[in-house]
Amino acid sequence: MRKFVFLMIIETIHIILKILIIVIPLLVAVAYLTLAERKVLGYMQARKGPNVVGVYGLLQPLADGIKLFTKELVIPHYANLFIYVAAPVLSFTLALIAWGVIPYDKGVVISDLKIGILFTLAVSSISVYAILMSGWASQSKYAFLGAIRAAAQMISYEVSIGLIIITVILCVGSLNITEIVLAQSSGIWFFFPLFPVAMMFFASALAETNRAPFDLTEGESELVSGYNVEYASMSFALFFLAEYAHIILMSCLTTILFLGGWLSPIVFFKGGPAWFGLKTSFIILLFIWVRASFPRMRYDQLMALLWKSYLPLSLAFVVLVASLLFGLNGLPPS
């Protein structure tokens, strides 16, 4: 009995350490992504960005974190207290859970599920509930309208993302994320044969994460700040962390599905987490560049882009890829 309890304790400690090894670097990455975004936007707009706190502003995320987490938690008088507080916690928790199946290298993953890509899509889809909860519980018309917009936008573009993922799955024959990466080890990443699909996935990822030019949920001239307008201090910080964790997650998925994950683009260089980080950083830089370069779309244009363009195109690519694979050499083994 004692041996069993001892083994259970050891196993629990092992699981906690694996989770912390993933979560702590992720939180640091999210913190410094905010600084990187402000710096890049600053240089694109002919200014320097944050450069006062620490050397070259490197301590700015720490200062922002201390400021937000030490402020008073202000709860609106008519808000539903439990749902109001639970929404940012749920959003942040789901943003972390999705990382449980993301491999940084072969074997470097918390849980290498056989249905890993489906798990990631499912967890990402559930996050829309946290946004709806925040908009409804705030008892604010601006927050509620922002939440409805966000829900409609995220649910719509998840359809496109799902069909695009099916296209890649057809080429691989597996829902396992590690196998999706290894299927590209022959030297041809899926970005090249599936270039239009990759472009649609990136645009859908922008819409899924509510980023410019699809940031209709926080149109300052209309909704002040969107679904989180009534949030401040720690609760606002949790929404903020969840949003940027989701951006990094979608960048990682783009890298995994179309850019070969941790595989090296140069034959005589060994692949690894460094290559995975470089490719993901490049996709994140594209997110920031798009924000600095393109104006916000109208809401009707946003919805028309999906339902009239991306949905038929992504469905057509599913049929085309399946037909080509079946006609030429048969579908990959399941």
UniProtKB/Swiss-Prot annotation:
GO MF annotation, one: NADH dehydrogenase (ubiquinone) activity
An example Gene Ontology CC term for this record: mitochondrial inner membrane
GO biological process: aerobic respiration
Primary site of residence: mitochondrion
Domain of life of the organism encoding this protein: Eukaryota
HAMAP family per UniProt: NDH1_NuoH
Family: Belongs to the complex I subunit 1 family.
Role according to the record: Core subunit of the mitochondrial membrane respiratory chain NADH dehydrogenase (Complex I) that is believed to belong to the minimal assembly required for catalysis. Complex I functions in the transfer of electrons from NADH to the respiratory chain. The immediate electron acceptor for the enzyme is believed to be ubiquinone.
Protein name: NADH-ubiquinone oxidoreductase chain 1
The organism's taxonomic lineage, starting at the top: Eukaryota, Metazoa, Cnidaria, Anthozoa, Hexacorallia
